[in-house]
Amino acid sequence: MKVKEIPGSVYHTLKLKSLKGKDLQTLRADHLPVIISLTSIPSRLHKVHITIRSILYQSKQAKKVILWLNENDKNHIPKSLKILCGETFEIRYTPLTSSHKKLIHTLELYPDDIIVTCDDDFIYNYYWLEKIYKQHLQHPKAIIGNFTRQIQYDADGNLLQYKKWTHQQPDNKKTILAIGAEGILYPPKSLSPIATDINLALELAPKADDLWFKAMALLQGTEVFQATDKPKGLIPIFGTQKVSLKKENIDKNKNLTQWKALADHFKLDLK
């Protein structure tokens, strides 16, 4: 988290905390036919309610918000999170510990629904869900990402390091990778049926759920689009950035090795 982001983070955190839990629990009649699915880790349990509040306090509500936690966290749920549970928001538990749990179980439970995933350490803009849903209406069969990269190879066909995967939009939609932090919308049946094979996911991409789901989109023949009208940038929640899969994957070049494993196993062709 950058120093200049701290004042904004504190301001929006206090604003969200001032909202009454019972007001956020009620599902409005004009809600969108969307399920928001995310996960969290033990070190963020006392902060994730801020993210949930920002998701519940949207210009257009989702019909359901599911937070997936490991079953060992069941007896450690803070009151700040419990008071938000209601008609819209619920907490579910899983034996999984990997980040894949943000989507895999929701795909199993709601295969015919639009699912939007997000991260647990950010405050989301008031128009975040409404905007990504409008993008979905323009491309109803495509996966929509608010933030994307281009999987890139050099002239000899060698995969470039993740840091060199640019944000430029290529003509070849196959190379577009949606990044989870800012939000990804998955229409029904946009991923291969084997997307929920957690054992295979953990074998090939144990620390890169975005790469796993990208491979599943390719197998299904689903295009990925960069949102052209996305809300203002994410606001990091103060005190949540100490543990990050993103940093580990980039610093140790794990994204590269995991994508190679996926591409080799599934014979993925991005040309």
What residue ranges belong to the model's regions?
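C-terminal catalytic/acceptor-binding lobe
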Residues: 1-19, 29-31, 47-50, 200-271
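A conserved hydrophobic helix/loop-capping motif in glycosyltransferases and polysaccharide synthases
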Residues: 35-43, 58
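Residues at the starts of beta-strands that form the adenosine-phosphate
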Residues: 63-64, 114, 223
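Cell-envelope/extracellular polymer assembly enzymes that use nucleotide-activated donors
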Residues: 33-37, 64, 212
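Short beta-strand-to-loop acidic/aromatic patch adjacent to the donor-nucleotide binding site
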Residues: 112-123
